[in-house]
Amino acid sequence: MAELACFCYPHLEKDSYKFIPFNSLAIKCMLTAKVDKKDQDKFYNSIVYGIAPPPQFKKRYNTNDNSRGMNFETSMFNKVAILICEALNSIKVTQSDVANVLSRVVSVRHLENLVLRKENHQDVLFHSKELLLKAVLIAIGQSKEIETTATAEGGEIVFQNAAFTMWKLTYLDHKLMPILDQNFIEYKITLNEDKPISDACVKELVAELRWQYNRFAVITHGKGHYRVVKYSSVANHADRVFATYKNNAKSGNVTDFNLLDQRIIWQNWYAFTSSMKQGNTLDVCKKLLFQKMKQEKNPFKGLSTDRKMDEVSHVGI
């Protein structure tokens, strides 16, 4: 995750802003600079290489002292920064909005995936600039629309029916912020269209998840799509979701947290997010993740959760 101010800076033109991507040498210069505390939140002028990000975001970049940041000296950083600027320059951002826009925290991996989709000649985003910009505006929180299959971050499609598409995420292969844990495996489920879904389509998806992905929990980060994650990573997702929800509420970026379909979401996660929306503390909410829930009546007749051991999926082992 990183603020948009880590990728570009605003230049005032008449009554709105044009956004310009940073170059890696300007960032490198900022990372070595001694900057007064009162200027930590201001864009840094490298004199030689142009404007650089505010020094308060130093930890967002990979250095000898910090291996958890972005690999900003890669060509992928330039591609992501340019894509963000193209999207922001396609809309009007006024003086009253610019600080709020640049402080927004976005998923770096999501944006890298959109670059990969843009470069894939077989992908619809390669052929439609309009759809590509729409996908980026959704990714950076500048659009109220949800991420549907056409505008999704992408990955490898492992399941699809008339209503849903399930993607295996490919973060292990990334250049900007690759996941280094070789055991990482995670999926995302997007809606093909943002419209009511038939029970038959939901039943098909639930059957697929119970049969093939029973070692995973189906959760949501509240943005209109599902995530299918290992049970061992659920607590980590809970910390991130709670922190983001609270930060958004604090900064005034209040968006409705979409709980999605209770028949698909893991029961304990639904309880956690419902409790979070009610204003409870993280500790109170997280207890619900590890609590034995009363089994709800199966909403789909004839769809059993009981499996013999030799029938259980080996995905995720």
Curated annotation (Swiss-Prot):
Its cofactor is Mg(2+). Disulfide bonds: none annotated. Its main location: host cell. This is Non-structural protein 2. It is found in: Host cytoplasm. The keyword ATP-binding applies. Homooctamer. Interacts with VP1; this interaction is weak. Interacts with NSP5; this interaction leads to up-regulation of NSP5 phosphorylation and formation of viral factories. Interacts with host DCP1A, DCP1B, DDX6, EDC4 and EIF2S1/eIF2-alpha; these interactions are probably part of the sequestration of some host SGs and PBs proteins in viral factories. Its EC number is 3.6.4.-. InterPro entries: Rota_NS35_C, Rota_NS35_N, Rotavirus_NSP2, Rotavirus_NSP2_C, Rotavirus_NSP2_N. One of its GO terms (cellular component) is host cell cytoplasm. ATP binds at residues 107-109, 188, 221-223, 227. The active site is at 225 (for ntpase and rtpase activities). Signal peptide: none annotated. Gene3D superfamilies: Rotavirus NSP2 fragment, C-terminal domain, Rotavirus NSP2 fragment, N-terminal domain. GO terms for molecular function: ATP binding; metal ion binding; nucleoside diphosphate kinase activity; ribonucleoside triphosphate phosphatase activity; RNA binding. Participates in replication and packaging of the viral genome. Plays a crucial role, together with NSP5, in the formation of virus factories (viroplasms), which are large inclusions in the host cytoplasm where replication intermediates are assembled and viral RNA replication takes place. Displays ssRNA binding, NTPase, RNA triphosphatase (RTPase) and ATP-independent helix-unwinding activities. The unwinding activity may prepare and organize plus-strand RNAs for packaging and replication by removing interfering secondary structures. Residues 205-241 are annotated as: RNA-binding. One of its GO terms (biological process) is viral genome replication. Pfam families: Rota_NS35_C, Rota_NS35_N. Belongs to the rotavirus NSP2 family. Keywords: ATP-binding, Host cytoplasm, Hydrolase, Magnesium, Metal-binding, Nucleotide-binding, RNA-binding. It is an enzyme of class 3 (hydrolase).
